[in-house]
Amino acid sequence: MKKLFPIIILFTSCASVTINPSILSPSNVEIPKKLHRLNIGLAQSRITTLEAVSSIIKQDEMFTIWERELEANIFDSGDEPMGYIDYKVIFNEVVPTEKGKRYFLITNLTFWIPSMVGYPIIEVEKIIEVEITIFNKKMKKINKYNIISKSEPGKLGLYNLYAVEANDMIATVAVTKDIIQIFKSRLESDVESINKQLEASFLSN
């Protein structure tokens, strides 16, 4: 039996998790009155350059979803941007839940023996906080939205640790989509005023 555990660990750790690219697709929920088209991001705020290959520019999943959602469901059909919209990530961490802290304590007090038969090592949740700021053409701030959301708790055990990276991506996508829906609901009551301010700045150039 003792020889069996390393074999199980080896095979489970070699397993892979397949993620369907469709999870990055925008929702099919448009806001009733659209926001005037804006430049997405300020300078390099929405892209990161890979260190290994400096010529490649990578957008991670949260900014991919954000850009697609803006284009599909938030911006109007105007050709020329009337300002800027910035999506700044303030906090993005996986943290243990209170139950997860108890799991971890029990696991360590029992020398990880229960985890060998499927007892969770820890339970965690993904928490993301963002600031979404809208600026006019002259870079004057019009409105700012601070939004926090978190994922459903997820348990980690000895035999699913291989899936941590994939699960983190799935949680990031879910939380980002929730943040965007919260933003859309708040924007609905402000969009008329924001559009008027964008128009005034744009026409005064």
Residue ranges of predicted features:
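C-terminal/domain-edge helix-coil "capping" segments
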Residues: 15-22, 121-131, 138-205
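Generic cytosolic/nucleocytoplasmic N-terminal low-complexity/intrinsically disordered segments
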Residues: 1-2, 183
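Sec-dependent N-terminal signal peptides
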Residues: 3-12
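Short acidic/His/Gly/Ser-rich catalytic and metal-binding motifs that mark active-site loops
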Residues: 49-50, 98-100, 153-158
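Glycine- and small hydrophobic-rich membrane-insertion segments that are intrinsically disordered
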Residues: 48, 53-61, 106-119, 160-166
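A structural "domain/chain start" motif
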Residues: 14-83, 148, 191-205
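Surface-exposed short loop/turn segments
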Residues: 81-142
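A mature extracytoplasmic/lumenal domain signature
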Residues: 44, 91-93, 136, 147-151
